[in-house]
Amino acid sequence: MEEPGEGLAGGMNVFLLGLLRGLSKRGIATDVLTRATGETVEVSAPFPGVRIFHVPCGWVEPPSRESAFASVDLFVERCRILMRGERIMPCVVSAHYWMSGVAARKLSGAPMILCYHTVEARKVPAPGAGQAPLSPIRREKEAALAREVSRVVCFSEYDLEENRRVLPELSEKGVVIPPGVDERFWHLPPREVARAYLGFPQGGMIFLLAARGDAGKNAAVAVAAFRAMRDRWKGPAIFLVAGQEGPEGASGGDVVFLGSLPHGGMPMLYAAADAVVCPSLYESFGLVPLEALASGVPVVVPEGTYWGDRIRSQGGGLVYPREKPDRFSDALLALASSAELRARLSLEGAAVAAPFTWEKCTASWAGLLASASTPGSPR
């Protein structure tokens, strides 16, 4: 349950903490089994009724999906020992991400609710990137899980429909439960306060990209679009990249890599920014655009994505064709050139984000868990 940007951690961890907090408020006791980074079992209790067991299973630095998959059997073995000792007998299991689904199937015969978060067959490879070593295995396991689990949760109708194309079993098992957005993103400090606190210039444009260092997040394309925009617009501007380290020798200049940041620091970054850039070609949902919209910050997204469709129809940002990088740069230029456009999109964005609450999300999850559970364990 690391912070987004640390190792392989991303928006899924943000979602899980929001869900666990909501389930706790509803009095739903929950045990979470996750990999430990150390050699001993650690237990944390972030919310009443919620226990997170960090189970050692051969953590390797730097972490990789390959090393994580190689540790699944050891993780399962040690989780069995822990579950016996703690007398954990779940009446329903919720698995998040395909490897968690593989482990959960081995650990428990209880009904399983799966949330893929991302599906391998839908991923759009980054330019020049080859097939990931785990890709064939992941596709096989994701297809098997679609057949075996009780229900599959997707975050939007768009995501469910796209997943059905590659996993037809979801036509009968799929259910849509959108995530929520934390209250703190609705109540930001003034821009001048945020910029002074973070040490950024008071004047000029600030574009923000928040994503871990994964080629599929398309950070390089976003930086190139910003550079192209700067060739045509001479006002002051900087481009912030949060969640990843920059290339060697890339320090200084108008592109600033902030490295890994705690999620608690994101509201201040959104408050300082004039626009948030979200160039990833495939997200099952995308919490960063949602947080930015709730914060009243215009977003820039590619078409052919959930947020591309929603923003095109409801506003809150600009959409560009994914195969035309010059149009990406045009969108940045349009935002830099017009305070009136930014103000209009800011108001639209808050309205677009308004339906996404943790109260609705956790109420739906509570109902789904109850409908799938078997009598027995209180957890």
Outline where the language-model segments fall.
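Short alpha-helical donor nucleotide-sugar binding micro-motif in glycosyltransferases
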Residues: S260-L261, M268-A273
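Carbohydrate-associated surface elements
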Residues: Y158, G180
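Short hydrophobic beta-strand element within catalytic cores of glycosyltransferases
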Residues: P298-P302
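A short helix/loop element that forms part of the nucleotide-sugar donor recognition site in Leloir-type
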Residues: H187-F200
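Conserved acidic donor-binding segment of nucleotide-sugar-dependent glycosyltransferases
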Residues: L318-P325, A334-A339
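Conserved donor-binding/catalytic core segment of Leloir-type glycosyltransferases
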Residues: P201-K217, V223-R227
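N-terminal subdomain of nucleotide-sugar transferases
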Residues: M1-V50
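Aromatic "clamp/platform" in nucleotide-sugar-dependent glycosyltransferases that forms part
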Residues: L281
